[in-house]
Regions:
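Residue-level detector of alpha-helix initiation sites
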Residues: 8, 12-17, 171-172, 275-276, ...
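Glycine-rich loop(s) and the adjacent beta-strand/alpha-helix scaffold that form part
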Residues: 27-29, 36-39, 122, 242, ...
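Internal hydrophobic alpha-helix adjacent to the cofactor/substrate pocket in enzyme cavities
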Residues: 451-457, 547-558
Length: 558
């Protein structure tokens, strides 16, 4: 039986980083197992491909949740990357660290070393502005104030090639963005023409692009590492289970090229299969709620009821507006517009195809007495209607000039779960978001809708409307706002927390070093270990977490 020092399950945002860092010095043999294919595909590399990949089963797990009681029986669609780079290869490219308090809360929950003072230097080590641009705004700073550039100074050496390009695309964003800035200014919302990478403020979003192409975790970290002789990558390889001996994880069984293969790990097995895949694989391997596993005929390796619990996600809503001037609808909604944008992109790697449709937004406080931002805004110069289950026709915008203002609560309180229903690894697990189960989330929805109402009443917004708002919040009482939120609200695709980090195995799956409680040789490194969801998009903190985990793993290796 072949052996590796480290076996990494999942080649996504975290797994790509681990494959790079653990193989970098040549001392360790590393295997990366990815269920999906290579990411070397046009629609994966082109930023606008986000809309094409939203329902592409070749690179997308396309999970469906169970009917949600608080959503009137609606189920929620969960796209997740099934390709090298994982969800960083199919997401909307927005890069945001969140808020310092998110990580301080991690530390306060019994996880020393995970406070913002500790992790900010990790972020600095891999973020790289591309091309060299104005420094980005940080918490507590005013627009135009000088800031630290991300640390990545050795431009000529091999290490410098292993960085994440975090790009200010404001020059390429649709000119409708000036209207969004005016709306925020009139509503007294902190805003800047310089993008924020953390904390409070509205601006154009930073994006993970490089030279007009998506810079996923695979592009940034895995591609440079794949030339190394001590790194093996298996794509289209579906993990079935992890095997244990004497309380230690020792091997991985996976299906590859039509046959089951078993490979052993001399040092560690690292689960990086994401907030859905990681608890699924643990449960299939006999680690989870013992009674539930026995009912499925599975041998219980360790009774760990916390596996698959504590599912957290951002849940939001969009408000659509008809505009009296051109938006991206006019580009993507006509053949001349699409052809012109396509030709420009092919020739120059610029224009609307070179960036996300999520172009503007940020974190805001919906009440001035709050100590931190509680709401994330999205202000998109494009509008589209969603289906009842949340699926979107992103490449077929509404047949009129339109735009969107949407929001989600930064730190929702409802907790869901991910549990297997079959011993067959090919059967998707049961995903229960449990959205809006907590009263806080309903209160947040009303408060944030009233905040958007303030934006609706700004003269700058009224000046660009072709007709009254499609959702006239001023005419809706709180009950109507909540009914609308239940009817149309949807995930923002930031699932996390299903194998949370913490000191007590009764409610946590891994310790602060990301080692699975009670089992040797097994760590979890992905968004499933988040003790609490971060305030913004989760790709940035997941990549940070993987860098910090690699430091821990290598330190233990000596």
């Amino acid at each position: 039986m072949a052996e590796f020092d480290y076996i990494i399950i999942g080649g996504g945002s975290a797994g790509s980083v681990l494959a790079d860092k653990l193989s970098a010095d040549g001392r360790h043999n590393v295997l990366l197992i990815e269920a999906g294919p290579s990411d070397r595909r046009f629609w994966v590399r082109a930023p606008i491909g986000y809309g094409m990949l939203f329902h592409d089963q070749r690179v997308n797990w396309m999970y469906d949740g169970v009917p949600e009681d608080e959503l009137g029986g609606r189920s929620v669609y969960h796209p997740r990357g099934r390709v090298l780079g994982g969800s960083s290869s199919i997401n909307a490219l927005v890069y945001h660290r969140g808020q310092a308090g998110d990580y301080d809360d991690w530390q306060a929950a019994g996880n020393p070393g995970w406070g913002y003072e500790d992790v900010s230097t990790v972020f600095d080590s891999f973020e790289h502005p591309h091309p060299d641009q104005n420094p980005v705004c940080q918490t507590g700073q005013k627009a135009g104030q000088k800031t630290r550039d991300p640390v990545n100074k050795a431009a000529g050496n091999a290490a410098s090639r292993s960085h994440l390009s975090v790009t200010d695309n404001s020059a390429e964003c649709h000119p409708f963005g000036a209207t969004f800035t005016s709306i925020c200014n009139e509503a007294q919302v902190p805003s800047s023409t310089t993008p924020y990478r953390e904390g409070e403020g509205v601006s154009s979003y930073l994006m993970t692009t490089r030279n007009g192409m998506r810079c996923s975790s695979a592009v940034a970290f895995l591609w440079p590492a794949m030339k190394r002789a001590n790194l093996a990558v298996r794509t289209n390889a579906s993990v079935r289970r992890i095997a244990f001996e004497a309380g230690r994880a020792v091997s991985v069984t996976f299906r590859y090229k039509g046959a089951e293969t078993v490979l052993r790990a001399r040092r560690e097995i690292i689960l990086s299969a994401g907030a859905i895949g990681t608890p699924q694989i643990l449960q299939l391997s006999g680690v989870g709620d013992g009674a539930s596993l026995q009912k499925l005929g599975l041998d219980v390796v360790q009774n760990q009821p916390a596996v698959g619990q504590n599912l957290q996600d951002h849940f939001g809503i969009n408000y659509l507006f008809k505009a009296n001037r051109p938006t991206l609808n006019d580009v993507f909604g006509s053949w001349p517009g699409r052809l012109s944008a396509g030709l420009r992109y092919v020739l120059t790697r610029r224009g609307p195809l070179s960036l996300s449709i999520n172009q503007y937004g940020g974190l805001v406080r919906t009440r001035p007495d709050q100590t931190r931002a509680d709401c994330q805004l999205y202000m998109n110069p494009l509008s589209y209607h969603s289906f009842h289950d949340g699926r979107r026709r992103l490449m077929r915008p509404d047949p009129f000039s339109g735009f969107i203002i949407g929001f989600n609560s930064c730190r929702p309180a409802s907790l869901g779960s991910v549990t297997i229903t079959s011993p067959d690894a090919e059967v998707q697990p049961r995903i229960h978001g449990n959205y809006l189960d907590h009263q806080q989330d309903l209160d947040d929805a009303v408060r944030m809708a009233r905040f958007v109402q303030r934006l609706q009443e700004a003269p700058a917004l009224k000046a660009v409307l072709a007709e009254d708002p499609m959702t006239p919040l001023a005419d809706m009482d709180d009950a109507a706002v909540i009914d609308d939120f239940r009817e149309r609200g949807s995930t923002v695709f930031h699932l996390c927390g299903t194998c949370r980090m913490g000191p007590d195995r009764r409610d946590a799956v891994v310790d602060p070093q990301l080692r699975v409680h009670g089992i040797g040789g097994l760590r979890i490194v992905d968004a499933s270990v988040f003790p609490n969801i971060t305030s913004a998009n989760t790709n940035a903190p997941t990549i940070m977490l993987a860098h910090k985990a690699a430091q821990m793993i290598l330190a233990d290796a000596g």
